[in-house]
Regions:
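Glycine-rich nucleotide/cofactor/substrate-binding loop typically near the N-terminus or early
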Residues: 1-13
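Phosphate-binding/switch loop-helix module in NTP-utilizing enzymes
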Residues: 13-56, 63
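A general structural detector for well-ordered alpha-helical segments in enzyme core domains, enriched
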Residues: 33, 62-65, 90, 120-124
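Structural motif
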Residues: 45-47, 74-76, 105
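Inter-motif core of Ras-like GTPase G domains
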Residues: 57-80
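Class I SAM-dependent methyltransferase SAM-binding "motif I" and its flanking Rossmann-like core
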Residues: 83
Length: 163
């Protein structure tokens, strides 16, 4: 379909999942879906699977596709172990490929020690500055997964990043 042009049964990297399904991810299909949705909607959020450097094709990773299309990115991070490193590596890769960063979402889903939450938040703000990105950071509180009350929080977070 237009909103999700590829769905594969095996939960793996896009390249492996496509291979296992006997398919190839065609970026022209992605391009058509994105363009169709851009024409229909004021806002478009393209959610990717697997991370910035996950392969889409044999010689194409997601981030290179995003860079070629100059699609602005919202990076989501958390206070989990390893997230400072993951966030810094991601910001470095974005800067190296000149991918525009709309902002950073700090997702507090789950139970995390207060000290780690605070330290990781400080480090995320520092990383944005260190890599030359605007300090657009939204803290997303832990929301019940299927709660209708969560939608206003998510909409406000999106608006604050896209303002």
């Amino acid at each position: 379909g237009t909103t999700c042009p590829y769905v594969f049964p095996f939960p793996a990297s896009p390249l492996l999942a496509a291979r296992m399904a006997g398919a190839v991810i065609d970026t022209a299909v992605l391009d058509r879906s994105i363009e169709t949705l851009r024409q229909r909607h004021e806002w478009l959020l393209v959610e990717a699977a697997g991370g910035l450097l996950v392969p889409l094709q044999e010689h194409l990773v997601l981030l290179d596709y995003l860079a070629a299309k100059q699609l602005p990115l919202i990076l989501v991070t958390s206070p989990r172990l390893g997230s400072i490193n993951h966030t810094r590596l991601s910001l470095e890769a974005l800067r190296a490929r000149a991918v525009p960063l709309v902002g950073l979402v700090y997702n507090l889903h789950g139970d995390h020690p207060r000290e780690i939450v605070q330290d990781t938040l400080v480090e995320c703000r520092k990383a944005l500055a260190d890599y030359g990105f605007a300090p657009n950071l939204v803290i997303l509180p832990d929301l019940a997964e299927s709660s209708a009350a969560a939608w206003p929080v998510l909409v406000n977070a999106a608006r604050s990043l896209c303002a």
